[in-house]
Every structure is written in structure tokens, then in C-alpha cells.
């Protein structure tokens, strides 16, 4: 874990993860588990992107796919899932009130490829 920007949060918020999640896979689960294992609640934001070769599923289909795997954590109130408009950048200023954290996965997780999954190669 690498903290890219330090905030002054009170620890009561959610760890937010933004992605296309096309498809949801164990690398994504590893990432979410990093926050859950620290006792944080998680907000999964699904980008509402146009359907194409890299994004074959609608945001609703993605939400249902993730919900099916994480239903117990959702019911416990540890995870929330929302759909957000597509974004092109995440911008911060000083005194942002929250940390910006990069999680660096181990090699076997980092090698998981949604593209290869979509192509049926793994």
C-alpha cells in the first residue's frame, strides 16, 4: 500500500474504488479485500461506460455480477455499490480530508487480466 495523498478523515467513511469491473474477477476481489481487512467499509463505483469490445456488460449487469459474489458483505453493511457517470480524471486539492491510496498487488494477482478473461484465455 502506498499513500499518495494524506487526508484528515475521521475513519468513519468508506474506501472508494472506481472501475469498469468488466468482468469482476479475483484481482478485483483482492483489491477490495485490502480495505475490508483494515476494517473499512467499501464503496464500489461502477463507471457507466459505453458498450464496446472492452465493456460488453451494462452497468446494471456488472452490479448484479458483483452483488452475487459480495451479497453477504452488502447485507452486513460493509459494502455499497453504485453506478456513476463515466469519468476521465480524479482530481484532488490540498486539505482533501481523505487519503489517496495505491494498493500494489502481488505478482500473481497483478497478472490477472480482464481482457484475457473476456477473450476466454483464462
Which residues does each PLM region occupy?
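Nucleotidyltransferase catalytic core that binds NTPs
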Residues: 1-122
Amino acid at each position: 500500500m502506498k499513500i499518495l495523498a494524506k487526508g484528515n478523515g475521521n475513519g468513519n467513511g468508506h474506501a472508494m474504488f472506481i472501475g469498469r469491473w468488466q468482468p469482476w474477477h479475483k484481482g478485483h476481489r483482492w483489491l477490495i479485500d485490502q480495505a475490508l481487512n483494515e476494517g473499512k467499509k467499501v464503496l464500489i463505483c461502477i463507471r457507466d461506460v459505453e458498450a464496446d469490445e472492452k465493456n460488453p456488460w451494462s452497468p446494471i449487469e456488472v452490479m448484479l455480477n458483483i452483488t452475487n459474489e459480495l451479497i453477504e458483505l452488502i447485507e452486513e453493511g460493509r459494502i455499497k455499490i453504485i453506478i456513476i457517470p463515466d469519468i476521465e480524471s480524479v482530481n484532488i486539492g490540498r486539505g482533501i480530508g481523505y487519503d489517496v491510496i495505491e494498493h500494489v498487488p502481488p505478482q500473481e494477482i497483478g497478472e490477472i487480466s480482464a481482457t484475457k478473461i473476456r477473450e476466454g484465455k483464462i
